[in-house]
Amino acid sequence: LILFIGFKIVSYVVKMAHKIFERSIMDTTLQTFLLSFIKIGGKVLVIFMAVTKIGVAASSIVALLGSAGLALGLSLQGSLSNIAGGVILLLLKPFQVGDYIIEGNSGKEGTVQAIGIMYTKLLSVDNKAIMIPNGNLSNASITNVTYQEKRRVDLNVGIEYSEDIKKVRKVLNALIEKEPARITDEPVKIYVNEFQASSIDIGIRYWVKTEDYWESRWRVLE
């Protein structure tokens, strides 16, 4: 009877929490995690109450759970660090679903598809799924490429020493001025970047909306 009534109460609490979360501005991934936590935690509490009701000493249950928890914790140390990492990512929000990120330790990069409890899933530009453990991700430096609304495109063009630099700059500037994705409020920069052994590197800088970055870069390089 205690289990039946208790589980009904837990289900009701979960439904109420779900309605409250839906009316809030809380991130969807965080909502799912918290609802799971409430549901599992509530059921564990109900079972604990039911067992103590039938005469098992609470101290015995606590001791048993403590021993089991210690053994489980040692065997799942890596998994627990990933869960903790997932919680940190959900709370601090260094990125969200749809952002393009670069993980500092391994250099893996891609668009965030999902932030799970154990792993974060990225989709690379060549359509590969990359699964990064949350424990690693929460302890690494993260570059969030899409954090800002606009992004600078940096390109290098090599020319021969015999070329007229002023003429090259004029041609390149005209090319970038015609680029449809360019943010016209931002200046175009054409400059001598470096002198190589057999060529001169001409640098190009201009700004685009973040979502237009790759298409614009590829279009200009063509």
Per-range role (PLM):
Residues E163, T184-E222:
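Solvent-exposed, non-transmembrane regulatory segments of membrane-associated proteins
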Residues A71-G73, D154-G158, K189, D201, ...:
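Short aromatic/hydrophobic contact patches that present stacked aromatics
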Residues I83, V171-L172, S216, V220:
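Hydrophobic alpha-helical membrane-association signature
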Residues L1-V14:
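Hydrophobic alpha-helical transmembrane segments
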Residues I38, V62-L65, I102, D185-V192:
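Glycine/charge-rich, flexible interdomain linkers and switch-proximal surface loops
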Residues I88-T184, W207:
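Soluble accessory domains appended to multi-pass membrane transport proteins
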Residues L1, M16-L91, V125, A129-K150:
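Membrane-contacting alpha-helices and adjoining membrane-interface segments
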Residues K15, K170-A174, E222:
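Generic recognition of well-ordered alpha-helical segments
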